[in-house]
UniProtKB/Swiss-Prot annotation:
Mg(2+) 1 binds at E379. GO terms for biological process: DNA biosynthetic process; DNA recombination; double-strand break repair via classical nonhomologous end joining; nucleotide-excision repair, DNA gap filling. It comes from Coccidioides immitis (strain RS) (Valley fever fungus). Residues 10-20 have a biased composition (Basic and acidic residues). This is DNA ligase 4. It is found in: Nucleus. Residues 46-61 have a biased composition (Basic residues). The active site is at K312 (n6-amp-lysine intermediate). Residues 1-27, 43-70 are annotated as: Disordered. Keywords: ATP-binding, DNA damage, DNA recombination, DNA repair, Ligase, Magnesium, Metal-binding, Nucleotide-binding, Nucleus, Repeat.
């Protein structure tokens, strides 16, 4: 029988002491090949099945055939059968299997340090292949353009290895290695770092496995399984509390060993943070509301309506664990983890005397007497002692490594841990205590170490008016933003809640929050960008509702194409992370499992190559605004998208989803109507259509357009109607037919307008009853055309919540005085609806009714230019349009009487490329304030203070950049992200 000899560097005796009640398997683990024969291959086969609604299933019973399962049900059935078999034939300890099924979640096994190229090199030596042969070249150079595309297994390194191994296998039948034996050998492999130590381990696998087993082994080593099911599905089927426990511990071992019996639920006390176990922290909610509404959403206590205002730090979210341990010099052991559960203890130190620790060696006096153990939540930032100011996030790791080499430098950049919460103190979890109580415990436990470990400060707010001065300060200091916190709230693990809210300043010409989109396609460039991918197709992942209906969780809708804002290093970085994973786009066999384009068979914006979302990268993209587009599957895209940065801390699962974007868009539109200072946003419940004027009734959202599938059947639900006459236009319907139509769509029919409250009167011609209602003048009379328009619009919006379109003047047979003005606001000056798709006939009449304008004023010309630029992508590539729509203000140094030569050259260059130049800083249209690269810090600070006054005026804030932004953008032939060119002060 297999025995667990070593897990995560611990002996079996140590594990027995740590987990005395862990389950023991009664029999040997299953053969390794059973993993792919009974689990991986069936799951992959299920991925290839066409998806469809679960409703289209055969019925069970004496007259029904065998039930046809939906792909999602079949996926669960495959996993359930494997788990049931394991429990029956092996035992309750499924940890050995889960380590190989979801290896990317196994934190107990060290990283192998083996990437594709290294494995290819080792296989060439093990199989004694000539490195210059076709197979040798393909293994060693699999990333080279053209090589991977020639293979049937293109983009799949493990599949490439399978092809090569299949030509020279030692075994053709499956081997007899068990799952536990494979785990034992992988533990040995993880403990090695030299080639001469790695080769014997891989040679043993080669001798005892056939090509298919080796292919799956390589996928396990690379942690790239692609089995058509996420860890969430495995966790849900294993135990109902498995995902919750993993969220608070990030420990696959705890999930398997503490939750082996599905009938024994996790106790509340067990679902708490634990020392030296990485948890998933609480996150701040994005909101786009006016300040009073944000405070309202925090649901502050009437007895204590105060809230806290903290500066949002530009660093990395880190949790610090400290406990007493006599085996560590100094008696205290430390652990550091990121939000994504990456262990950074090696970087910041495991004890007071860790010579490699960039932080812990400075913390000997950081804790109050009596603190034996503690868990702190905070932000690790980079601090520059010379400027006595924080530096951008991208410099953090460099600063930490520099601190390791020279720990007592007084001038070098260093990591600084700013603490804003405490979760655990002296064996007691504090998550259920209020933030105010936790802060008291934090301040009593920590003795700050200047510019090494500090408690993050906060301001107390009593009303919305207290937020604005703090936001002005943030702008003046070029900080990230603010976080508002409810001091009476508990700590909510792995949750994003209104108790904490982000507030970011909204800058000119940008659409609120950055969009983190997964790359799904690529387009080859021309000219100076020829020979490589120059622009990328980004998508939005589908939501849970579509997954439940059978869609692949990885499926993405095409959303935007971005080719601006990239520098040569940016392209190189993306290439590094995606080389070898691209596949040629085959129009006859599009990858519909992963990507859905607009246009059906026409395949609008079809990329040259595509990539699986789980092998791709996430780009942070900024844009000017959202605009309708039939070229992208979402029905929407963004104007002037620009690359901001590569989000290596995110993957396809955490990239923006369709619903998340629609929520973001709805919030942006709602706040656009308010005359208050606006902030960045993210999540709400319902997305609304972009409109020209404020609406009182929600309109139609083109972004979620669905094909015609008939009336939704609920559009008039909860409404009362009194149909008085038949219909003549646009359809001839009798009174009875109109009543049937209303009832079929959820409405109720009455034969008088006084029988039920809020009854709508429907009529199109004058009768005695119509005249009677009209004479009383208490009820408006609506034409039947409104019924038809509502039903038709909801057919177009199939799949969205049913919404009524607002009344238009054309819908009204008679309007009471109190409603006339409101209804008139639902159309523009030409009677074009803001919320409804008009028909071609209506559009034709509308155009005829418009007066001719022989001479267009400048604003109209500018608007036309913008529309041309939006529709013609080639205009964006013209250097003469590079700074179009940008308004720049150039600031001379206080010691100069006129602009310096570099500033004048930059100004001329920007104007040549389409920019406008504003002479006064007070100009409301300014998008960028440009200064010289050698401006003095005092001048920069003064300028930021002046710009911050825009906050009080409720205006957006211009970017503050050096002339390098203009120069480098001109060289790159693309507008680059402004944050890279912000001056330091």
């Amino acid at each position: 029988m297999d025995r667990l000899n070593n897990v995560g560097g611990e002996t079996e005796r140590e594990l027995d002491e740590k987990y005395p009640n862990r389950p023991r398997n009664k029999h040997s683990t299953l053969p390794f090949h059973d993993l792919f024969l009974t689990l991986f291959n069936p799951l992959n086969g299920n991925k290839k099945r066409p998806t469809g609604p679960a409703a289209a299933r055969k019925k069970l019973g004496p007259h029904g055939g065998q039930q046809t399962l939906s792909p999602q049900e079949l996926r669960r059935d495959i996993i359930q059968r494997f788990i049931s078999r394991w429990r029956k034939e092996v035992g309750n300890d499924i940890y050995p299997a889960f380590r190989l099924i979801i290896p990317e979640k196994d934190r107990d096994r060290a990283m192998y340090g083996l990437k594709e190229k290294t494995i290819g090199k080792l296989l060439v030596k093990i199989m004694k292949i000539d490195k210059n042969s076709e197979d040798g070249f393909n293994l060693l150079n699999w990333k080279l353009p053209g090589q991977s595309m020639a293979s049937r297994m293109a983009g799949d390194f493990a599949g490439r290895c399978y092809e090569v191994i299949s030509k020279r296998p030692i075994r053709t039948d499956v081997g007899n290695m068990t799952i536990q034996e494979v785990n034992d050998k992988l533990d040995v492999l993880a403990a090695t770092s030299k080639e001469d130590e790695q080769i014997p381990v891989l040679e043993e696998f080669y001798r005892n496995m056939n090509p298919e087993e080796l292919m799956w082994l390589i996928r396990i080593i690379l942690r790239q399984m692609k089995v058509g099911a996420t860890e969430r599905t495995f966790f849900e089927i294993w135990h109902p509390d498995a995902e919750s426990l993993f969220s608070i511990s990030s420990s696959l071992r705890r999930v398997c060993w503490e939750l082996y019996d599905p009938n024994v639920r996790l106790e509340a006390d067990e679902a708490r943070v634990t020392l030296m176990q990485c948890f998933q922290p609480q996150l701040a909610q994005f909101q786009m509301h006016s300040f009073p509404k944000m405070i309202e959403r925090m649901r502050l206590s009437p007895d204590d309506p105060t809230f806290w205002i903290e500066e949002k730090l530009d660093g990395e979210r880190i949790q610090l664990h400290m406990m007493s341990d006599d085996s560590i010099p100094g008696g205290k052991r430390f652990g550091f983890w990121s939000r994504k559960a990456k262990d950074y203890t090696y970087l910041y130190g495991n004890g007071f005397y860790d010579e490699n620790g960039a932080l812990t060696r400075h913390l000997k006096d950081a804790f109050a007497d009596g603190v034996d153990n503690i868990i702190l939540d905070g932000e690790m930032i980079t601090w520059d002692p010379e400027q006595d100011a924080p530096l951008p996030f991208g410099t953090l790791k460099t600063a930490a490594l520099s601190e390791q080499r020279n720990p007592f430098s007084a001038t070098g950049q260093r990591p600084l841990f700013r603490i804003f919460d405490i979760l655990y103190l002296n064996d007691k979890a504090l998550t259920r205590y209020t933030l105010r109580d936790r802060r008291r415990a934090l301040e009593a436990s920590i003795k700050p170490v200047h510019r090494r470990l500090e408690v993050h400060t906060y301001e107390i707010g009593n009303s919305a008016a207290d937020i604005e001065p703090q936001l002005r300060k943030v702008v003046a200091e070029a900080s990230e933003g603010l976080v508002l916190k409810n001091p009476n709230s508990p700590y909510r693990l792995n949750d994003r809640h209104d108790d904490w809210m982000k507030v970011k300043p909204e800058y000119m010409t940008e659409f609120g929050e950055s969009l983190d989109c997964v790359v799904i396609g690529g387009y080859y460039g021309s000219g100076k960008r020829g020979g490589g991918l120059a622009s990328f197709l980004c998508g939005l992942r589908v939501d849970e509702a579509q997954v439940r209906q059978g869609a692949s969780p990885m499926k993405c809708y095409s959303f935007l194409k971005v080719g601006g804002g990239f520098t040569a290093p940016d392209y190189a970085n993306i290439r590094h992370h995606t080389d070898g994973k691209w596949k040629d786009w085959n129009p006859k066999k599009p990858p519909t499992e992963f990507i859905e384009l607009a246009g059906g068979d026409a395949q609008y914006e079809r990329p040259d190559v595509w990539i699986r979302p789980d092998e791709s990268v996430v780009l942070c993209v900024k844009a000017a605004s959202v605009t309708p587009s039939d070229q992208f599957r979402l029905g929407l895209t963004v104007r002037f998208p620009r690359f901001k940065r590569l989000r290596m801390d995110k993957d396809w699962k955490s990239a923006l989803s369709i619903q998340e974007f629609m929520d973001l868009k709805a919030n942006a539109e709602r706040e656009q109507k308010e005359k208050e200072f606006k902030i960045d946003n993210s999540r709400r419940k319902r997305a609304k259509r972009a409109v020209k004027k404020p609406l009182t009734i929600a309109g139609y959202d083109e972004s979620k357009r669905a094909g015609f599938t008939g009336p939704s059947g609920h559009v008039f639900e909860g409404m009362n109607f009194f149909v008085i006459t038949d219909s003549v236009e646009p359809e001839k319907k009798s009174k009875l037919e109109l009543e049937q139509l209303i009832k079929a769509n959820g409405g109720k029919i009455y034969q008088t307008h006084t029988a039920a409250p809020n009854t709508l009167c429907i009529a199109e011609r004058r009768t005695v009853k119509v005249a009677s209602v009209q004479k009383v003048a208490k009820e408006s009379i609506i034409r039947p055309s409104w019924l038809f328009d509502c039903i038709k619009q909801n057919e177009v919006d199939k799949g969205l919540p049913d919404l009524l379109i607002p009344f238009e003047p054309r819908h009204m047979y008679f309007t009471v005085k109190s409603q006339e003005e409101e209804i008139a606001r639902h159309v523009d000056e030409y009677s074009d609806s803001y919320a409804r798709d008009i028909t071609p006939n209506e559009l034709s009449k509308l155009l005829v009714s418009m007066p001719l304008i022989p001479n267009l004023p400048p604003p109209h010309i500018s608007k036309t230019e913008t529309q041309i630029q939006e529709r013609e992508s080639t205009f964006q590539e013209l250097r003469g349009w590079l700074f179009k729509n940008q308004v720049l203000h150039f600031v001379k140094r206080r010691s100069d009487s006129m602009l310096s030569l570099p500033l004048r050259l930059a100004s001329n260059l920007a104007r040549f490329a389409g920019a406008s130049v504003a002479n006064e800083l007070e100009d409301k249209s300014i998008t960028h304030v440009v200064i010289d690269t050698d401006s003095q810090p005092a001048d920069v600070s003064a300028l930021r203070s002046a710009i911050s006054k825009r906050v009080a005026a409720g205006r957006r804030i211009p970017h503050l950049v050096t002339i390098a932004w203009i120069q480098d953008s001109w060289k790159a032939e693309s507008l680059l992200d402004e944050e890279r060119f912000a001056p330091t002060a």
